[in-house]
Amino acid sequence: MDLEEAEEFKERCTQCAAVSWGLTDEGKYYCTSCHNVTERYQEVTNTDLIPNTQIKALNRGLKKKNNTEKGWDWYVCEGFQYILYQQAEALKNLGVGPELKNDVLHNFWKRYLQKSKQAYCKNPVYTTGRKPTVLEDNLSHSDWASEPELLSDVSCPPFLESGAESQSDIHTRKPFPVSKASQSETSVCSGSLDGVEYSQRKEKGIVKMTMPQTLAFCYLSLLWQREAITLSDLLRFVEEDHIPYINAFQHFPEQMKLYGRDRGIFGIESWPDYEDIYKKTVEVGTFLDLPRFPDITEDCYLHPNILCMKYLMEVNLPDEMHSLTCHVVKMTGMGEVDFLTFDPIAKMAKTVKYDVQAVAIIVVVLKLLFLLDDSFEWSLSNLAEKHNEKNKKDKPWFDFRKWYQIMKKAFDEKKQKWEEARAKYLWKSEKPLYYSFVDKPVAYKKREMVVNLQKQFSTLVESTATAGKKSPSSFQFNWTEEDTDRTCFHGHSLQGVLKEKGQSLLTKNSLYWLSTQKFCRCYCTHVTTYEESNYSLSYQFILNLFSFLLRIKTSLLHEEVSLVEKKLFEKKYSVKRKKSRSKKVRRH
């Protein structure tokens, strides 16, 4: 980009009113203050100096020839913006409303750029050495609803194209020169202008953008829109390659050269972790200082009553269990709007793990009905089996043993396919990464050798062609009454585990064991510990099944079950606390 050649252009920027212009590689004028790219080209005043050229349009000028080796000058934030654009498009293709990309994610990203002092502020961090001041009045709530698109439906430009700013900012803005310090360094160490600086930047109180943060932005946007996609669904869609994440950089335009330090910023070779993305979601929401999110009400997909029904259907459990899960939700207060709604500006900002909580409620109901102590559930199964044999025309009683056998087989098959798919996953991108242009030929040669070896190996083992991408679905297990090979338990009765007492129904099981006897102290990093050997095989299977569905650690689900029990049996825990305090007093 040449600032000297752009000095002749004296018009004010339509976005920030500054008169500070540079030239892109295509010959377009761009504002060095807000990076707004105009449609005006540099005028060619003397064509005699340029051989073999023709004037095709008046006042259009001649596009500058792209240097294919150097490519565009671009910043790291623009790379993340392009990835967010691709992820938003993928979510749109999955059925999410266009408002998520056009309004919600647009405003979240713009607010992040200002809060992190990368754009929409005085002296962005990558244009001057002075510490910039964020203009807080630029992002009023009325401004959020009226601003034009940042991530355009038509294209994703290399620079931020829009964003209305306050009048005070227009009068106080000054032109900033593009930093020359990193130009020679970036040509060797990174493809982006600020790749080296960005990888070394550590500023207290600033949330640094990473690849996992892109998923946090997506989930925040989904949560704001109250879309029918949970965090576990989002991560599963990433795993199934419906949403760009692994090797997302290979979708960059050819002119955006990526090498050197950019490898560590955009290259990632690990699957996103549920707990990590959850924490980053809360972190980003707090950093952006977002207002209270729209209420999660009973008719919202993320409400536990609806999610419980969804997961009961998925794991082939009786529909009658839904009334029991709703009762637990009511008793624990987990269906209250204030409990479910995310409020980043609250004193203790935290959002609910909606999917994990719903599954934990189902586990608690299973313990209430069947105890899950490797004994009582099997005795109830014997009663159900005998009843079903004698009354084949009546509505069948739910048989826990038969359900366990069918689900165990389906679960093992599904998990084996999942493990095989993960083992076969090719982490290397089609677009090789390299540290410098010196390494470029070697990187491409190695990639070519790997592709050839894979083809030869496939021929030797006579492996069938890899199946195409699976169509996205909210369900991983499907159960229907028409399926003759597998029993569908949705319509089965819980009469074998319930007994009538007056006008109410009680469980035949009068016992209950707590998943956690004592919670860890507040300064500990976890709620409780989980060791499989300490629990029954039935309980282990239930946790493993649901953990696989949500792609989470078993210990995380065990913690959530313990928290549900703590709310449900609050009196029992309070009695234990009093006893422990009295013992301490006696010791003194």
Swiss-Prot record:
Region (C-terminal cyclin fold): 262-372
Renumbered residue ranges of the record's region N-terminal cyclin fold: 74-261
Binding site for Zn(2+): C13, C16, C31, C34
Residue ranges crossing the lipid bilayer per the database entry: none
Acetylation keyword on record: yes
Start and end residues of each stretch annotated as B-reader: 40-68
Name of a matching Pfam family: Zn_ribbon_RRN7
GO annotation (BP), single: nucleolar large rRNA transcription by RNA polymerase I
Cellular compartment(s): Nucleus, Nucleolus
N6-acetyllysine modified-residue sites: K440
GO CC terms in record: nucleolus; nucleoplasm; nucleus; RNA polymerase I core factor complex; RNA polymerase transcription factor SL1 complex
N-acetylmethionine modification, residue list: M1
Region of interest (B-linker), ranges: 69-73
Zinc fingers (RRN7-type) by residue: 4-39
Protein name: TATA box-binding protein-associated factor RNA polymerase I subunit B
Source organism per UniProt: Homo sapiens
